[in-house]
């Protein structure tokens, strides 16, 4: 142990850890305080001297009561799952969750993010189980008594909250990237799906290495899931832990890997969070904002520009839909509890701020700055200030205004946009007025596209005042003016456009959000012929989210035959199961018995969401047929929408004897899943039928 602030006293985190009698070398033991082991050393040590402390203890994590956060809903540190094996639906497991300071519940340690060390764990486990920890498994010793000692060694320094161990009955599926072992620990029944669930990890590594200019810095990478996990996932160094929601069967994966962006998020943490760690919880943005934004980067790279922009848009909306958080600074030097910083500001808002920063400096400088930040702080700590210095070093620009505004400030702009054509001057006037309540004015670099007679002219302006006016040449009234043309800014805007302008915008759209704005306005003006034209065109859009939005916009009661035919086509053969699901829902709203055979056929689709939508549609026109199919489906393994559809129909039309099935389905679902939330309604509906006081 080498600690520059120690001289003759050592203070170590101690949460419900009982010290046991032991010979302690070079240490005069004192009674522990409530939360710390506070001990006098035998002499004064200089910062360069190394000394060893031995502590014999028993940890009691089940007795610890700590505050949770929005991201992590418990704080025991170490968890025993189904330890006595009494629950036949759940395997026996042990796993740990260190963030924020849960490691010190089971391990006496200086439990702060700016403390880094190597580690070695010797785990005695039942021989039938496997273990996982940070670093490499360097040795296994058979005790000849049904147990085994696994020795895991981590020889590169990392923070205590990233210390990890897990034990359980897992199957290990091996992969490889540039000679480094990639391991996927799965429950036995998911062995065949392991590569489909985790198999993009090598491609993600290659992409992140390429944009950062830094190879994956650790000896191996393993991924594992834990039952009853208290969060979504955790980037424990070399050993990421996922919720069991990552485990998807073959039918689920037909609808796409719902956990792909989470896998990308946790991997990116191995640079931003593990290699360079936030120096304090106040600076958690340099961990979480980057991991959040990595999802946008990965989807943009792997699935195209629209997919990346959609991910960015969803993050923006998640932040904007939490107005109570708007007054929080991204870098939070003042908070009531460290858990409070894990919120939409540190994640989604921070990710959108990085998106603006990337656009401000350009891709080349953005990724070079990230490289510089990582190289200069590797195996150490980072902060927003260090990030700023890296960007200024690469770009040669003073970025005080950007970081003061977005990192060390709060809120976001609310703008009112007015457009006027001045025929005598042959100009278009754009007035941008900031109306946010805070006593602050944002500095905003804004890209503007002005379309005149089909020709696009691009301009770059700066909005630095509460009200700014901009004039642009226009020989005739513009077809459309697209402000924030690349949809970069984190703001709320209020602007009025005609349906003709939105029709032009959709037809000449350069990105996903332009088209989304157009179909949203068209949906509000559904009786207008131009709005109808926008929505009909959107039914054939190249991006599935736009097609879904267009379907949702039509009122089933007012569908014309051509549009109904198109929606039927989408329900039958769209490449996206989510679009099929939406189209079936739209057809269901017609209550046409002529679709009974199709709905019945689609209940057997290989996709859970398609079959579930079809079952709901069938129930609207023939509840007896739907009940029969739901009863048959209840004898099989079902998930996602098919599960919620089956349980809803059984609860509504079935007898008391369906209670056991629904109770079992409800019980086995992850508590954090949307599926369990929706099933709560059906479960409650069923209870009044059960005659069991």
State the predicted function of each range.
Residues 1-217, 344, 359-361, 377:
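Acidic/His-enriched low-complexity segments
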Residues 5, 152, 184-433, 481:
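Hydrophobic alpha-helical and helix-loop surface patches within well-folded domains
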Residues 64-78, 132-135, 162-165, 233-236, ...:
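Short, solvent-exposed loop/turn and secondary-structure capping segments
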Residues 97, 125, 148, 268, ...:
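Non-catalytic accessory/interaction domains
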Residues 427-431, 438, 494-497, 501-503, ...:
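Ordered core of a single globular domain
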Residues 489-491, 514-526, 537, 547-559, ...:
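Structural detector for internal amphipathic alpha-helices that build alpha-solenoid repeat scaffolds
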Residues 495-505, 527-539, 559-572, 592-604, ...:
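Amphipathic alpha-helical scaffolding segments comprising HEAT/armadillo-like alpha-solenoid repeats
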